[in-house]
Amino acid sequence: MKRMIISLVCCLFAMCGPAGADAPKPFPDFTFKRVKPPSTSQGPRITVQIGPKTGEPDLASASQPTSTPQDQANWFWSQISPDIGSASAGRIEGAVNHIQTTAANPLVAPRLADLQNIASTHNTDILRATVGTRVSPALVLAVIHTESSGNIAEQSSAGAQGLMQLIPATADRFGVADPFDAAQNINGGVAYLDWLMGQFDGDPLLVLAAYNAGEGAVREHGGVPPFAETRTYVPKVLMAWSVARGLCRTPPQLASDGCVFIVKGS
């Protein structure tokens, strides 16, 4: 009888099965796989590149201009060659004519009265500095207006100083002890322009590009460098030049021609 009861209990357990047998496995998709490390002679299999998160701007590219330099000043450089191989002292006339006649020109010509005020204040210093050089006083006046609007105390965030915005290295190079002294600053700026005239065959476009970006940048890029500021700077100074030469008793034709300003009291 006792054996019969034990047999009956065992049968009942066999029919029910273990508790929780029908419950899902805790990690049904989890499997173990043993992977051997690569041998020392085996090269890397995976290259991991970490980039900016999706939706977050790349800080390096976010600071770049939204349009290319060529787009910003294309109205000028599409017709006037920026290449160093096109260097010529005489092409200033065609460049100025293009500036004055193209409807696409976004630049605003400086007021004659503003240029006249600068000429009246610094006439003597400009004439003295340009004697015996290849730099027209009208070009100096145009550069001063573009760089500082005639403000002797002007100082840029990049460290350029004075009327013609000389950086310390250029000021030191051309013997300017006090860049905020008008006469010294003009002497240094004219000396630099004259030196650049000799470097770039008297081509005013390349000279102005080098004055803005450095002669090394012009040589490196084989002409006017593709910098937005420089590509805009050159036609801007040439536009000021076209107004400044109207203040000369005999308007200069080349950027190296002499000029005697018609100023108040003269």
What are these regions (language model features)?
Residues 2-133, 137-141, 235-266:
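Cell-wall glycan-active module
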Residues 154-177, 188-197, 209, 216, ...:
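Substrate-binding/active-site groove segments that recognize
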Residues 135, 146-149, 169, 242:
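Solvent-exposed coil/turn segments that connect beta secondary-structure elements
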Residues 109-117, 125-131, 151-157, 172-182, ...:
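Second-shell loop/turn segments in exported
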Residues 144-149, 188-192, 202-228, 233, ...:
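Acidic helix/loop microenvironments that form the catalytic cleft of cell-wall polysaccharide enzymes
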Residues 125-126, 145, 152-154, 158-163, ...:
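Short, structured secondary-structure boundary patches
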Residues 134-142, 182, 202-210, 249-250:
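Surface-exposed patches in mature extracellular/periplasmic domains of secreted proteins
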